[in-house]
């Protein structure tokens, strides 16, 4: 059965071209969502892949960091991919991700672990506080949190903080255990169908929260006994989703050629993030793990 790769892109077209070329395999269908604010579409539309089918989504969400719009963009991808399925796995990637294993390796890995859900769960010490702060309080102006105007960012942060404290008596009411983790996942057909079926609940409950994309899918999986039992790993958030992401050296760290050995020795399947400013590591990854390697 084929795999579906769901890509959320907004920035570098050259890097996106590398990612698409590395996923260009007859066993893959690729679904591409380009942020409505981005001007990348003109550069993407002429692209024709030789083996994989590429679907460039017409419905484009204006994605804002920390805002419900990120969840809406994910739902656009999940819903479009379901129309063309079923698929063995649905892989959610950003436009700044790259595979760090060959397509043969990736497909073999998921065949050996068929039925597992690759969803990272964060059990860190700050989870409870983060959950109360982001999920229980009301956040009213998250669409302006990262405006291109620096002064507006500062004003919005202060206003959000003030209003969230003012509205403390009117906290969101939770009737489930929240879970948190990276929004980059690889999940089964059954899991995607379930996530899509819960869309009305998700859009209502996670509205006026902060960074809900870190919580919604993990919460759905965590509260479903079958999907929770199928989690690949609960011990490590990024082992759980098989992504190599370094938050200790950056937000997240941008991989360079100096990290070649770490990338080469990692057991993870995908890594982020990359930047064309460090083109040498990107060229090395493409040569090592590209579709023709």
Regions found by a protein language model. Give the residues of each.
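ER/Golgi luminal nucleotide-sugar-dependent glycosyltransferases, focusing on the catalytic module
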Residues: 1-293
